[in-house]
């Protein structure tokens, strides 16, 4: 799917519901775009559990507008809608009967709305998107002969090349209105008629709590969002395509001279007025209905998004308990490549959590390294030994990282090396290699500092006697023991 075409599926007629899609090309996601539908759980609940979904939406509609028992039952589909006009019910019955006959013949015009009909009409909408600058669009009638040719072609399902120049934009615009006007019921349905009248009455309140004449746009948008959620799927799909077309047309009113209000006057009788009623039947409601359609055109870009609380309720319905997880959901979670197709919000949250954990771990390691340096540089004391013992109790948590290497323990001078040096200096005899020591300390490559000082005190080896040599060896052994004990204590300190 290409970015920037969220309604492409609906224009082709291949989708059953409007999907608001967000396409992300985040480089951290292996350069694979992720398509995320924020209303996924809303549409899932709508298709899998329509009764639960309808009850959820209608309960929130009644919170915004006051619907008496009869009108609420009509909205829920429990009663037939009672519409203005004495013969509205009977004429509606015969009109529905005629539409069924037309549907059997595969006729698009005059038949109930289907995906096939939307696919045919979407050709007209796409063509009009390219010709929005025509002055008087949707107001100036086209040529009736060309319109009949185009209508027959749509009913027969033949391919039409609207860009060939054979048809004018006014022909196509008039035919689109004709299609909407010949539907068995208006695009916004009869059972929603009274709800739209109540939405038009939503106004702001003053400081004293009294109603004013200023429309409450936020509540009206919220009510329309909810009402559009319970429209039949084909009606909702075509309504979105139509309102988007009218919105784009009104944006070019400096060229086509068609404002949102002018467009509402053209389309309100086709998409909102009940069938077979006159202006006298509607009386004072005509202004409300026209203003309502004007409001829909101006705010069409906001009306097909589910309110945030509906999204949250639908999400909790499926994710709040493992018992709600279906087999299809489990297959989706375990399918190959599901990690790359996780919702964008979940991946973003996981990335933020991992970054936060890395920052916290980095700060902890820096603090531990600083503490380790401080303790290591302390002079030998009881306090230092106590801290070292505490370090030894938790080696994994308090061991500094590899960039701060533990200073190596100084190598101990071996007594055999010093003894061999004395014998070579005094006796001039070769030294026999002694057996290897049990400990793993390797032979030092140089004489320790203390042994060098001791050797310098001995004077010339040529004048040294055997007794003096034994005395020096005894001193050497004692010095080695002290030095070995001192080095052992330093080894423990370094650990």
From Swiss-Prot:
GO biological process: one example: signal transduction
GO molecular function list: GTPase activator activity
Keywords: GTPase activation
GO cellular component, one term: cytoplasm
PROSITE patterns noted in UniProt: RHOGAP (PS50238)
Domain Rho-GAP as annotated: residue spans: 98-304
Residues marked Arginine finger (site): 139
Matches recorded under InterPro entries: ARHGAP19_RhoGAP (IPR047941), Rho_GTPase_activation_prot (IPR008936), RhoGAP_dom (IPR000198)
Bias type Basic and acidic residues, positions: 350-362, 433-452, 470-481
Region ranges (Disordered): 327-362, 393-495
Pfam families: RhoGAP
PANTHER family reported for this sequence: RHO GTPASE ACTIVATING PROTEIN 18,19-RELATED, RHO GTPASE-ACTIVATING PROTEIN 19
Function: GTPase activator for the Rho-type GTPases by converting them to an inactive GDP-bound state.
Protein name per its UniProtKB record: Rho GTPase-activating protein 19
Gene: ARHGAP19
């Amino acid at each position: 799917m290409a970015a920037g075409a969220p309604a492409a599926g609906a224009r082709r007629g291949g989708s059953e519901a409007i999907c608001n899609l967000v396409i992300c090309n985040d480089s951290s996601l292996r350069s694979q775009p992720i398509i995320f539908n924020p209303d996924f759980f809303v549409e899932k609940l709508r298709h899998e559990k329509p009764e639960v979904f309808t009850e959820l939406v209608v309960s929130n509609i009644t919170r915004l507008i006051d619907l008496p028992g009869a009108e609420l039952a009509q909205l829920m589909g429990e009663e037939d809608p009672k519409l203005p006009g004495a013969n509205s019910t009977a004429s509606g019955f015969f009109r529905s009967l005629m539409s069924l006959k037309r549907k059997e013949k595969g006729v698009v015009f005059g038949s109930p709305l289907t995906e096939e009909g939307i696919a045919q009409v979407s050709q007209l909408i796409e063509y009009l998107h390219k010709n929005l600058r025509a002055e008087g669009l949707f107001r100036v009638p086209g040529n009736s002969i060309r319109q009949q040719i185009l209508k027959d072609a749509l009913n027969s399902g033949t391919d039409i090349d609207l860009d060939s120049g054979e048809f004018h934009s006014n022909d196509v615009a008039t035919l689109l209105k004709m299609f909407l006007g010949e539907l068995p019921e208006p695009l916004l349905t009869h059972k929603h008629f009274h709800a739209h009248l109540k939405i038009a009455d939503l106004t702001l309140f003053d400081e004293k709590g009294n109603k004013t004449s200023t429309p409450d746009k936020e509540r009206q948008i919220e009510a329309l969002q909810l009402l559009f959620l319970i429209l039949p799927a084909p009606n909702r799909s075509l309504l979105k395509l139509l309102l988007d077309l009218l919105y784009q047309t009104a944006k070019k009113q400096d060229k086509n001279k068609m404002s949102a209000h002018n467009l509402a006057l053209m389309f309100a009788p086709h998409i909102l007025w009940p069938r077979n009623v006159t202006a006298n039947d509607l009386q004072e409601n005509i202004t409300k209905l026209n203003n309502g359609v004007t409001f829909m055109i101006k705010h069409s870009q906001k009306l097909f998004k589910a309110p945030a609380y509906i999204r949250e309720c639908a999400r909790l319905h499926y994710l709040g308990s493992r018992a709600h997880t279906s087999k299809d959901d489990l297959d989706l979670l375990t399918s190959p490549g599901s990690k790359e197709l996780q919702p964008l919000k979940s991946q973003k949250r996981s990335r933020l959590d991992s970054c936060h954990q890395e920052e916290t771990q980095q700060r902890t390691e820096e603090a531990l390294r600083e503490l380790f340096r401080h303790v290591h540089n302390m002079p030998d004391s009881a306090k230092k030994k106590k801290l070292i013992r505490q370090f030894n109790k938790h080696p994994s948590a308090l061991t500094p990282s590899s960039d701060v290497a533990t200073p190596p323990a100084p190598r101990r001078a071996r007594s055999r090396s010093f003894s061999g040096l004395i014998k070579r200096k005094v006796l001039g005899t070769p030294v026999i290699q002694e057996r290897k020591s049990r400990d793993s300390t390797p032979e030092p490559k140089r004489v320790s500092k203390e042994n060098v000082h001791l050797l310098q005190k001995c004077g010339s080896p040529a004048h040294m006697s055997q007794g003096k040599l034994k005395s020096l060896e005894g001193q050497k052994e004692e010095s080695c023991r002290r030095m070995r004990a001192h080095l052992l204590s330093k080894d423990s300190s370094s650990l």
